[in-house]
């Protein structure tokens, strides 16, 4: 600012020896504030304005820039601290963290539903349980055994995801009616994404099986691949799920035969390098899971009867009705539990006898009690009971290693 121009009367008031300032009249002019020379040009000055006598507070606001019209809001740039002295996360940081984790969480949730976790858990438990049948003493539980078991479980889970993913790819329209929350049916995954996922998991399964070098393991993966593909893919002479009998046979072959025999032989012959033998517990596991696999094959279509009827899938539930198929499934399972109790009672091992008899009796009682209270007109109740059947499936694989 080059100059500050004041009125002569004010300059006189500032002179030494000046007596006193005359009182300001209400119609007095405010002095021009300033004039600024910029680059040698004409000075720019604020013009004087007429006022009706500003008050002291108004002058203070004017000269001190305290007017609310000129106040610049202050926003803290650093994060504050709470009473304990710990820094609090700013809202911007919280928003950034949320924006990062939300898509990751959504992707994981979609893949979780795509993988059909109840089948993944069943596959893992069955392989671990059957592999333990090859263990003869505690020294067999070695790093070699654990490595062979892990290789088998991972390869089988990859193949499991391929099979359930392929089924969803060819059932998109049906699942929009029966299972609208699945990612392909809901539109979260595009068909191209589904193709990429099932192709990747099939390749990883075969790649791991080939790298391990176990003939029983690779054979189990290959047969599961063939049956799973034929079950779902919509090509001439395939899509075996359209036939209730053939669909049940596919599930029975994988769940009851391949899982029990192939993975037992993988541990017995490839890991332990022992001759192939079919023990009493292995025969029991195969026979019991034959019943259980038939039940799963029949029961899984009960909640899906609406979509199956629309798209021409001739399941037993469509042909016979939900109620009749439901009680057939319950009867088959109760029969299997009775056989298991009788077999446990004939065991020469005392602890095995008690464990198998009491365990299967408890499961049979729970099944009967639950089946009597179900509302067969409610799809939600039927779906919940189907998941209960899978829990019984898991429990059986906890009992199988105790059979001796």
Swiss-Prot record:
UniProt keyword Chloroplast, yes or no: yes
Lineage, uppermost ranks: Eukaryota, Viridiplantae, Streptophyta, Embryophyta, Tracheophyta
Keywords (A to Z) from UniProt: Chloroplast, Membrane, Plastid, Thylakoid, Transferase, Transit peptide, Transmembrane, Transmembrane helix
Cross-referenced PANTHER family: HOMOGENTISATE PHYTYLTRANSFERASE 1, CHLOROPLASTIC, HOMOGENTISATE SOLANESYLTRANSFERASE, CHLOROPLASTIC
GO CC annotations, alphabetized: chloroplast thylakoid membrane
Protein name (record): Probable homogentisate phytyltransferase 1, chloroplastic
Family named by the database record: Belongs to the UbiA prenyltransferase family.
Membrane topology field: Multi-pass membrane protein
Gene name linked to the record: HPT1
Protein's organism: Oryza sativa subsp. japonica
Pathway: Cofactor biosynthesis; tocopherol biosynthesis
Subcellular location: Plastid, Chloroplast thylakoid membrane
Region annotation Disordered: where it falls in the sequence: 68-96
């Amino acid at each position: 600012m080059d100059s500050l121009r004041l009125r002569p009367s004010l300059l006189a008031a500032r002179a030494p020896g000046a007596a006193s300032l005359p009182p300001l009249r209400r119609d007095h002019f405010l002095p021009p504030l300033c004039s600024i020379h910029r680059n040698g040009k004409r000075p720019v000055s604020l013009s004087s304005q007429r006022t009706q006598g500003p008050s002291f507070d108004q002058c203070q606001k004017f000269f001190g820039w305290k007017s609310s019209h000129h106040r610049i809001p202050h926003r803290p740039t650093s994060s504050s601290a709470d009473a304990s002295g710990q820094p609090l996360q700013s809202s911007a940081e919280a928003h950034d963290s949320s924006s990062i984790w939300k898509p990751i969480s959504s992707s994981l949730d979609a893949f979780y539903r795509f993988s059909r976790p109840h089948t993944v858990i069943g596959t893992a438990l069955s392989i671990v349980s059957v592999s333990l049948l090859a263990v003869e003493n505690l020294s067999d539980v070695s790093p070699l055994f654990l490595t062979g078991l892990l290789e088998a479980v991972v390869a089988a889970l990859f193949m499991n995801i391929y099979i359930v993913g392929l089924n969803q790819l060819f059932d998109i329209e049906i699942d929009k009616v029966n299972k609208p929350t699945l990612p392909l049916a809901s539109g979260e995954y595009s068909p191209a994404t589904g193709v990429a996922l099932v192709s990747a998991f099939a390749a990883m399964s075969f790649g791991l099986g080939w790298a391990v070098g176990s003939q029983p393991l690779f054979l189990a993966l290959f047969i599961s691949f063939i049956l799973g593909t034929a079950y779902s893919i919509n090509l001439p002479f395939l899509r075996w799920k359209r036939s209730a009998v053939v669909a049940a046979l596919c599930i029975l072959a994988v769940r009851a035969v391949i899982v029990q025999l192939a993975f037992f032989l993988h541990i017995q012959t490839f890991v332990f390098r022992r001759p192939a033998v079919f023990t009493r517990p292995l025969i029991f596991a195969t026979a019991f899971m034959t019943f259980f696999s038939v039940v799963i094959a029949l029961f899984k279509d009960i909640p899906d009867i609406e979509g199956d009827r629309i798209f021409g899938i001739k399941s037993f539930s469509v042909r016979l009705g939900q109620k009749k198929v439901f009680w057939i499934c319950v009867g088959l399972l109760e029969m299997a539990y009775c056989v298991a109790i009788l077999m446990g009672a004939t065991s020469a091992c005392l602890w095995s006898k008690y464990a198998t008899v009491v365990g299967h009796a408890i499961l049979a009682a729970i099944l009967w009690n639950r089946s009597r209270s179900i509302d067969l007109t409610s799809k939600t109740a039927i779906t919940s009971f189907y998941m209960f059947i899978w829990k019984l499936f898991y429990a059986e694989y906890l009992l199988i290693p105790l059979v001796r």
